[in-house]
Amino acid sequence: MKKLILLITMVSFTLQAQNLTVSSGTSFTVDKTGSVTITGNFSNSGTFTLNSDADEFSSIIVSGSSTGNIDYNRYVNAVGTDEWDLIGSPLDAVSISTFVTANTAGTATLATNGSAYAVGEYDNATDTWTNYTTSTVGAAGNFDIGKGYQMASVDGGTGILKFTGTVASTTQTQAIINNDAANSNAGRRWNLIANPFPSYVQGNSNADGSNNFLTVNADKLDDSFEAVYGYDADGTGYTIYNNSSGALRLAPGQAFMVASDDTSSDNLSFTTAMRTAVGGDDLIVGDVLEDSFELILKLYEGDTEIDYTRFYFKDGLTLGLNPGYDAGHFNEEASLMSRLLEEDEGVGFAINAMGLENVNNVVVPIVINREAGTDFRIGIDTFGIYAGTNVYLEDNVQGTMTLLNEGDFELNPESILSEAGRFFIHLTEDTFSNEDEVETNLLNVFKADYNNFITIEGLAMQSGNTNVKLYGLLGREILSTSLNNLTNTQTISTETIATGVYVIKLQSGNRVLTKKLIIK
């Protein structure tokens, strides 16, 4: 069949055609469960509509040329505290002014507040959100395809917002940048981007081995944050998806955060080979693969979940950084994070991936950030590891070992909790009690690429001073100092030290730590 010409039709299944033409005065509607795949060209002179709801999204894939505007009735979360949605336009050449006019006329579906529309941009240079208003929307131009926006529908409405534009049928790019290179908190590494196609996009290697978002863009993302960060719309923050997740597919127009590794602008790619008609919810993920294991711990205040951290085990992974499997937390001051066992550069991880051989033989530092005087508890949420593995939470200040398999760890801290060095997760086949003399002692040193200082942490857990020496590669001593144990984390300036590769040596009692540092 060379060409399919349709007058009036409703598609609630998968339709494939070589070419598709919708004639003037005719209607073609794709139900939320339907999809259209065109190997040739698409032309619309009539009315072509794609529908969706909260967890089902129709799609169209065009391999050839595409002409004529179509409509995508896209579901968007309602306005409300900690709700809203992150959305990009699933169509090209969509006027923002026309969009807000169409969705606030008659029975309005786009939320408003006075002169402000519930559509806005994120600026990572200043870490701010700005909504369009009646006075600014006229000059807003078109939605930047591939860019994400904050958006919300009216409370109690249908949740459907209509986008009118053309089908993108070629590879799309979107600029990203790291505006927090010096960790100054003036800007952020996070960029809000979106699936630019009116079809699903393969997100990770479990969805497609090579034609997926994370694999194609791996060299553009920060190695410690090589993941898709999806907004939860419930006040809990962001859920992280990477190659440790099941098959990930991104819905049409779905927006999400990614972390750039470059202080200069760089372009991410959404290739046509990533497109697929297969999917489901906004961020749809299949089950964790059978040859991998996971343990998820959650922190609660009463019955309210505050945060979680995930440990993932798979053959071939290391105790150091595994880009695409390990993933740093979106908020580096989060309530619960873990640290790498090797190559620890001070990043708090929400997903800590390691080899399968470590399931019964690992001690992982965790970071708990909590205010003094507030009860909290930590317990096992998902136990997807060996049945005989004991999970202990060590508190080396209280001298306790809590077996999480049997009950939660509970604490009302007398002082503010922060930084690494006090709490550890033990995965072991052994059995401990509080009478056993088990005290894990973290002593770590690192220099972040863009910092002008060396960070030493774990000092408060040392019995006395820690001696620090820095050597050049030829053995010449560059620096020598002693740090007390009154403050857990301390820094040493590198502003007067030349760029190069050095060796740093820490000695605390009988314990010696030697590590290579690169000073830029």
Model region roles, listed by residue range:
Residues 1-23, 433-435, 491:
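Bacterial Sec-dependent N-terminal signal peptides
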Residues 17-30, 69, 73-84, 89, ...:
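Boundary/junction segments of secreted and surface-exposed precursor proteins
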Residues 18-79, 164-166:
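Extracellular beta-helix/beta-solenoid repeat scaffolds
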Residues 53-100, 177-190, 195-198:
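Extracellular, surface-exposed repeat architectures
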Residues 125-144, 148, 152-488, 495-499, ...:
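Compositionally biased Ser/Thr/Gly- and acidic/asparagine-rich
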